[in-house]
Design a protein with these regions (language model features):
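Transmembrane beta-barrel domains of Gram-negative outer membranes and organellar outer membranes
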Residues: 1-211
């Protein structure tokens, strides 16, 4: 199996808030079953601290190497952030994501996701999509769009053009950095953000016959 360690950092360029999230994903018996956790550390308008954590289970329902792949994910949201400081919601929540990936050609793939997050008093719906040009085996150009709507009337729409590249090592370790620039459109017009991504992926167990 493969273990993945992911760090992301997002900052709104017009304001001081930012969020760093660390995610670690492990196989459960096979690569088809994945268990992960996400822990955010963030700065709100006045305070900094840990936000609400998440425990996630993902099932690869349709194989990742198929032309169309499907891996639904269910998450439990844990109120580890301070609600009074604006760092958390103060309640348990649940989240469902339905991501689909499709190979559109020899060098173009697309990812789509529909999600719903439920906590007391508000439900959030998300729809996202991206197109990725595999410019080379280790360099990709990405354009992503994400829409968010809440039952309290909040709306957001952001387009994220960016790039990512890979460093592959003989040991099986793969390091993937990425950067993107968020552009708010529609209800988010005028907003801008910076996004940084870094992942480390390696085998969970040594190959047979190796230490």
């Amino acid at each position: 199996g493969v273990v993945q360690h992911i760090g992301t950092w997002v900052r709104a360029l017009q304001r001081s808030p930012w969020v760093f999230t660390f995610t670690q994903e492990w196989p459960l018996g096979s690569q088809a079953h994945q268990l992960s956790y996400s822990i955010p550390f963030q700065r709100a308008s006045r305070y900094s601290g840990f936000g609400d954590a998440a425990i996630n289970y993902r099932y690869q329902l349709v194989a990742a190497d198929a032309r169309v792949a499907f891996a639904p994910r269910l998450s439990l949201l844990i109120p580890t952030g301070s609600e009074s400081r604006g760092l958390g919601n103060g309640n348990l929540g649940a989240q469902l994501n339905l991501p689909v990936s499709a190979t559109l050609g020899s060098s173009v793939v697309s990812h789509w996701n529909a999600g719903v997050t439920a906590i007391p008093d508000v439900t959030t719906y998300t729809i996202g999509g991206s197109v990725i040009w595999l410019a080379s085996p280790v360099f990709n150009i990405v354009c992503e769009a994400l829409w968010l709507g809440q039952t309290n009337g909040e709306r957001a729409l952001v387009v994220n053009p960016g790039v990512r590249w890979a460093h592959n090592f003989a040991s099986g370790l793969q390091i993937v950095p990425g950067v993107a620039y968020g552009i708010g459109v529609g209800p988010s017009r005028g907003e801008q953000s910076a996004f940084f991504y870094l992942s480390f992926e390696h085998r969970f167990q040594a190959e047979s016959g190796r230490e």
